[in-house]
Amino acid sequence: MKTLRNIMFAGTGSDVGKSVIAAAFCRIFRKDGYAPAPFKAQNMALNSFATIDNLEIGRAQAVQAEAAGIPCHTDMNPILLKPQSDHTSQVVLNGKPIGNQDAYTYFRGQGKDYLRREACEAFDRLAAHYNPIVLEGAGSISELNLRDRDIVNMPMAHHADAAVVLVGDIDRGGIFASLYGSMMLQTPKDKNRIKGIIINKFRGDLHLFDEGRQMIEHLCGVPVLGVVPYLHDIGIEQEDSVVTEKMHGRLMNDKVNIAVVRLRHMSNFTDFDALDINPRLNVFYTTDKQMLAQADMIIIPGSKSTIDDMLFLRETGLDQ
């Protein structure tokens, strides 16, 4: 079977569904007889996955590798940033921690060129064994202040010679502005690499959006390749976004209520996935004393900054 061009799923913002769509295409390409592999140059997430060599990568790439039917490897996510505080992250390179850096040093420091080379070399190693490579971007592709230091979105798409598909989330509103704005803020070179749009998380009757689809194509100058319905309980880990969905959880009378204390530097909340998928349980994250008092069970999760979170519990009275 002939080879395919590499493909990147970039986003109008964070949590628009890039990880899930990339996983879906890994499985589609696999079923079509190709040998795909996922790749994300740089990830920022508290949660990591241990490879067979006991090295760390982002959990999304581990899920995507499973969808592709291959073992996960650090080349799929060579740079992983694990937040330690509001301003500092642990830098994991090729699966191994190499130290902590504050945001300014990371984005402005001399080491950025070194990390860029490492990311490109990891991609090249992966591409030597798999085709196509299914790349995932990070956040928005339109962060103008970070463009010259970006190593995960359009610069990586150029290195991979990947066709870029822009993913937008219609469920959060503002789909026209987010898609059009993202396209218009691209340089001519970058804009030319974007070949189509996927509209994600659509609710309702698709036929009612036919006119909107045509408007987007006219405004953006590229085809809308598909509209993906809003999917419930798909069970695919999406980095840290699952917590944001449960930050405003509530007590349920017909279920066992499990309250997870929402620490400032909570780590590995995927530890609670086994509880979360049980229909008899209601898992939610909170710092509300009244909700904690009414819960059937309280869990204090792991922390990336134990002392700071212990002080937080004492200062807020949650330790009582």
Give the positions of each predicted feature.
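Flexible phosphate-sensing "switch/lid" loops adjacent to ATP/NTP-binding sites
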Residues: 1-319
